[in-house]
C-alpha cells in the first residue's frame, strides 16, 4: 500500500487588535529608578565633577545623570556628593551652574520632605574593591602620581563603568593596556595628565 503524507493547513491565529487608546509602557530596570542609587556611579560622577580642567560636556553629562537620582542623607554624607554639587553652583559656565542649582535644590527639597525615607543602595563587594585598589595602584605608578589622586580614581572608575561594573576579562585587559600605554608612551601620559586627552576618550580607545 502506498503511503501518503497528508498536509493540513496551519491555523493562523488572528492578530490581536491593538487598542488605539491604550498606553505603551516601557519596562524599567531597578537601577533606572530615581531612589535606587548605585554608589559606584555616584562616586564616578563626583570624580568627573572634581577633576581639574574637566570639559563642559563631561560636567553637564555628570550633572544630568545625578539629576536622575535622589541619594539618601546617608549617601550624601558618605560620598560628599552634595558638597561637590553645591560648589558647582558657582561655576563660571552658566549652563553648568544652572544645572547644578537644579540638582542641589531638588535633592535638598526631597530630603527635607522625606527625612526618614531611605534610598536603596547598591555597593560593590569586598573582593571587587580589592581588585580595583590593585588596579588603581598600577595606574598611579604608571602616571607617576599618588594613589589617591583624582585622575587615578577617575581613570579606574571610567574603566570599571565601561566594563559593566564587573571585574572580568575585559576589565583586566583594559587596565593592562592603559598601564602599558601610560608607562611607555610619555606623550600620551602627559596629554592625560594635562587634560588635553579626556579620560573617557583615553579609556574608550584602550577598552579590550
Curated annotation (Swiss-Prot):
Protein name: Transcription elongation factor A N-terminal and central domain-containing protein 2
Family: Belongs to the TCEANC2 family.
Pfam families named among the record's database cross-references: Med26
Start and end residues of each TFIIS N-terminal domain: 40-114
GO biological process: DNA-templated transcription; regulation of transcription by RNA polymerase II
Record key words, sorted: Acetylation, Nucleus
InterPro entries: TFIIS/CRSP70_N_sub, TFIIS/LEDGF_dom_sf, TFIIS_cen_dom, TFIIS_cen_dom_sf, TFIIS_N
Compartments (UniProt record): Nucleus
Main subcellular localisation: nucleus
Lineage of producing organism: Eukaryota, Metazoa, Chordata, Craniata, Vertebrata
Keyword Metal-binding recorded: no
Species whose genome carries this gene: Bos taurus (Bovine)
Ranges where the record places region Disordered: 1-22
PTM sites of type N-acetylmethionine: 1
TFIIS central domain sequence ranges: 131-208
Source organism, top-level taxon: Eukaryota
Gene Ontology, cellular component aspect: nucleus
Amino acid at each position: 500500500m502506498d503511503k501518503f503524507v497528508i498536509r493540513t493547513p496551519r491555523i493562523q491565529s488572528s492578530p490581536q487588535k491593538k487598542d488605539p487608546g491604550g498606553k505603551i509602557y516601557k519596562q524599567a530596570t531597578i537601577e533606572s529608578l530615581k531612589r535606587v542609587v548605585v554608589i559606584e556611579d555616584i562616586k564616578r560622577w563626583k570624580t568627573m565633577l572634581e577633576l581639574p580642567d574637566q570639559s563642559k560636556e563631561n560636567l553637564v553629562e555628570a550633572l544630568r545623570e545625578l539629576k536622575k537620582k535622589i541619594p539618601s542623607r546617608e549617601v550624601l554624607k558618605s560620598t560628599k556628593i552634595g558638597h561637590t554639587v553645591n560648589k558647582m553652583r558657582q561655576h563660571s559656565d552658566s549652563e553648568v551652574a544652572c544645572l547644578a542649582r537644579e540638582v542641589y535644590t531638588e535633592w535638598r527639597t526631597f530630603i527635607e520632605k522625606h527625612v526618614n525615607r531611605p534610598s536603596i543602595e547598591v555597593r560593590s563587594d569586598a573582593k571587587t574593591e580589592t581588585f580595583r585598589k590593585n588596579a588603581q595602584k598600577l595606574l598611579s605608578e604608571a602616571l607617576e602620581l599618588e594613589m589617591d589622586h583624582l585622575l587615578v580614581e577617575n581613570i579606574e572608575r571610567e574603566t570599571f563603568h565601561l566594563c559593566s561594573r564587573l571585574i572580568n576579562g575585559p576589565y583586566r585587559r583594559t587596565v593592562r593596556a592603559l598601564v602599558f600605554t601610560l608607562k611607555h608612551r610619555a606623550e600620551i601620559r602627559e596629554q592625560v595628565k594635562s587634560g588635553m586627552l579626556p579620560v573617557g576618550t583615553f579609556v574608550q580607545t584602550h577598552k579590550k
